[in-house]
């Protein structure tokens, strides 16, 4: 005869609840999904749907939800979801850094937009690069890759496996430094040009005091900076694809094998 008691019910609920927590934590930090314009009800319904579909294929965890081990697993699922989402945010952070550097060099750092997601002001160039980044993100279906990686994480890092280790922080630090290095490299042509331009204008100003840096240098820097930025646009899509490949390689071959 089939017996079903409160312990079995608690195990059944917990096996659905822990994947749901990881998915919700991921959607709260991952790009596109954490946007203020995405309805919270849509994110919750999508999380419940994914958790319901993958639950029959996940290994059973015989741990009660309201126990010390259960609370530890709950904290661990939140940590894994947030870590996956924040790792994906590096794609947009690299372009944001490039835009801030370019805007500072051109002289457009004073032109700011309010970012409703981060509650801070971002420069005009950063906003423009982020819009391009968003278009590339959707064109390449990266959001679907992220959902696939999230589902795959339940097989590579099961719910009852200890995820916490001393190497996690250093692994993320190394990867984030590599992503931000790429962001600086994207803005490097403009940085080098304006370094040379400032040096030349300084020498000309010393040789001929009639040449004013403020009346000639700033408009010239703005004009040439926009022309170089137009040239960089042809490189932005290959640059984004390179970042996506680095992100996918890191998640599949490093993060999910910790």
Swiss-Prot record:
Full protein name: Flagellar biosynthetic protein FliR
Record-stated family: Belongs to the FliR/MopE/SpaR family.
GO cellular component, one term: plasma membrane
Recorded superkingdom: Bacteria
Bilayer disposition of the protein: Multi-pass membrane protein
Function: Role in flagellar biosynthesis.
Cellular compartment(s): Cell membrane; Bacterial flagellum basal body
Transmembrane feature ranges: 7-29, 44-58, 65-87, 91-113, 129-151, 182-204, 211-233
Source species: Buchnera aphidicola subsp. Schizaphis graminum (strain Sg)
Keywords, in A-Z order: Bacterial flagellum, Cell membrane, Membrane, Transmembrane, Transmembrane helix
GO biological process: bacterial-type flagellum assembly; protein targeting
Cross-referenced Pfam families: Bac_export_1
Cystine pairings recorded for this chain: none
Keyword Membrane: yes
Family matches, as InterPro entries: FliR (IPR006303), T3SS_IM_R (IPR002010)
